[in-house]
């Protein structure tokens, strides 16, 4: 007997070898997909009737700062320097481990509700984020943020904590948690420190998550300090490779794109955050043309202000059409691939497609909605019309986290109340 059967669904596999099923069934057992077809002879403990719905791989958010849900709407419509130095950094300085847990749990709740089944996170007090992931049932690739700032003592302390975290949590939560090293950015970490991080990552077989050329300020600072841009510096020290996840990548030259493609670097495109902070427009179309694996991320809620990857997909598709003056740029299915297949590749997880033998991370999207009627093209609807709130069921590792809009994995009201209280108390401490 199977654990779960999802039936009567439009099955969007995202598997290029199989295509979609207009009326299909997905069978799940022991956390994996065991059968996909029109019908099954199997019976199951749980049967989900997905009539008028799409079953698809869960979305993958490849760059966020989960605990920053506590800063949602806290400091908007400000110049970047004022936003960071006058508001975000002072607030972060007052965060406690308990705050990070409550903020991360709120992020997990939001992602379960909006169809994200796995995410990559960089922050601090990361044991608390890992505990939140463990409790929520989601899948995540986590790292402790390392900000050395050319201070050797601080760098040694940060790297020690990063290493401890990598080793403590790798493979935890029934394998749902992966760990990475998280040097913040080339303009906040010295060349020597970045080389040390690369060595430690090699030693532990861990990936690396880094911010890269998010702003023009980084580009100018790197050229002034090193006489070269961030990508060329990282290339020169042997830092880049297919285990590197680079967030933002806005201020890339054509030569930078060539290097990223050659080294197999994974990019997280954070389109809404980049627009909100006026960082610029990442050359996504050029990156994809050069074979760079481009995925999607939301960044933290302080600069987005939510974790809805459906919004991210639509915005990415629209921005790059107008930016290239080409309505055919980033068609719907390609954007869906960025949000699923490419994201899973970036995090090195056996997810992102509905395929026999792969981990059962999938969502059911309710298509019987006014804004989704009529439906001529399912991929188009998912990108241009659907919202995170249309997700009715979320399954991760073969466990139902939300069924028919009811969250089963967490006490939803308590999570929201605890986060609201934590945010209010945090602001009180900041203003004291």
Swiss-Prot record:
InterPro entries: Amidohydro-rel, Deaminase_MtaD/DadD, Metal-dep_hydrolase_composite, Metal_Hydrolase, MTA/SAH_deaminase. Substrate binds at residues 92, 184, 214, 299. Zn(2+) binds at residues 63, 65, 211, 299. One of its GO terms (biological process) is S-adenosylmethionine biosynthetic process. Its EC number is 3.5.4.41, 3.5.4.31, 3.5.4.4, 3.5.4.28. Keywords: Hydrolase, Metal-binding, Zinc. It catalyses: 5'-deoxyadenosine + H2O + H(+) = 5'-deoxyinosine + NH4(+); S-adenosyl-L-homocysteine + H2O + H(+) = S-inosyl-L-homocysteine + NH4(+); S-methyl-5'-thioadenosine + H2O + H(+) = S-methyl-5'-thioinosine + NH4(+); adenosine + H2O + H(+) = inosine + NH4(+). The keyword Methyltransferase does not apply. Binds 1 zinc ion per subunit. Its cofactor is Zn(2+). The keyword Zinc-finger does not apply. SAH is a product of SAM methyltransferases and is known to be a feedback inhibitor of these enzymes. As a result of this inhibition, organisms have evolved efficient enzymes to metabolize SAH via different pathways. The pathway found in methanogens differs from the canonical pathway, it uses the deamination of S-adenosyl-L-homocysteine to form S-inosyl-L-homocysteine for the regeneration of SAM from S-adenosyl-L-homocysteine. 5'-deoxyadenosine is a radical SAM enzyme reaction product which strongly inhibits radical SAM enzymes. Homotetramer. PANTHER family: AMIDOHYDROLASE-RELATED DOMAIN-CONTAINING PROTEIN, AMINOHYDROLASE SSNA-RELATED. Catalyzes the deamination of three SAM-derived enzymatic products, namely 5'-deoxyadenosine, S-adenosyl-L-homocysteine, and 5'-methylthioadenosine, to produce the inosine analogs. Can also deaminate adenosine. The preferred substrate for this enzyme is 5'-deoxyadenosine, but all these substrates are efficiently deaminated. Likely functions in a S-adenosyl-L-methionine (SAM) recycling pathway from S-adenosyl-L-homocysteine (SAH) produced from SAM-dependent methylation reactions. This is 5'-deoxyadenosine deaminase.
């Amino acid at each position: 007997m199977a654990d779960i059967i999802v039936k009567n669904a439009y099955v969007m596999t995202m598997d290029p070898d199989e295509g979609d099923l207009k009326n299909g069934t997905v069978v799940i057992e022991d956390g994996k997909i065991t059968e996909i077809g029109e019908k099954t002879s199997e019976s199951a403990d749980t049967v989900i009737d997905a009539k008028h719905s799409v079953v698809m791989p869960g979305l993958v958010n490849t760059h966020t700062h989960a605990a920053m849900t506590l800063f949602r709407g806290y400091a908007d419509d400000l110049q970047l320097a004022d936003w960071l130095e006058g508001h975000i950094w002072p607030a972060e300085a007052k965060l406690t481990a308990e705050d990070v847990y409550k903020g991360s749990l709120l992020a997990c709740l939001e992602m379960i509700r909006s169809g994200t089944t796995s995410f990559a996170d960089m922050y601090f007090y990361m044991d608390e984020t890992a505990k939140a992931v463990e409790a929520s049932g989601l899948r995540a690739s986590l790292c402790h943020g390392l900000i050395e700032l050319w201070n050797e003592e601080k760098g040694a302390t940060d790297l020690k904590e990063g290493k401890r975290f990598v080793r403590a949590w790798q493979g935890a939560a029934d394998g749902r948690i992966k760990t990475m090293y998280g040097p913040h950015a080339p303009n906040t970490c010295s060349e020597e420190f970045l080389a040390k991080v690369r060595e430690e990552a090699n030693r532990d077989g861990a990936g690396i998550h880094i911010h890269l050329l998010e702003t023009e300020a980084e580009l100018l600072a790197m050229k002034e300090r090193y006489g070269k841009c961030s990508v060329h510096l990282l290339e020169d020290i042997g830092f880049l490779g297919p285990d590197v996840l680079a967030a933002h990548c806005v201020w890339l030259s054509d030569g930078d794109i060539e290097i990223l493609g050659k080294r197999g670097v994974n990019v997280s495109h954070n389109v809404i955050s980049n627009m909100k902070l006026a960082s610029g427009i990442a050359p996504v179309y050029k990156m994809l043309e050069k074979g760079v694996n481009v995925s999607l991320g939301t960044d933290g809620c302080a600069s987005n202000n939510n974790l809805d990857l459906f919004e991210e997909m639509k915005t990415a598709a629209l921005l790059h059409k107008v930016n290239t003056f080409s309505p055919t740029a980033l068609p719907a299915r390609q954007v869906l691939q960025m949000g699923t297949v490419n994201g899973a590749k970036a995090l090195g997880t056996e997810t992102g497609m509905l395929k026999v033998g792969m981990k059962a991370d999938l969502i059911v999207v309710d298509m019987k909605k006014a804004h989704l009627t009529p439906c001529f093209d399912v991929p188009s609807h998912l990108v241009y019309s659907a919202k995170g709130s249309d997700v009715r069921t979320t399954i991760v590792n073969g466990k139902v986290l939300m069924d028919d809009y009811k969250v089963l994995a967490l006490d939803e009201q308590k999570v929201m109340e605890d986060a609201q209280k934590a945010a209010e108390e945090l602001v009180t401490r900041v203003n004291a």
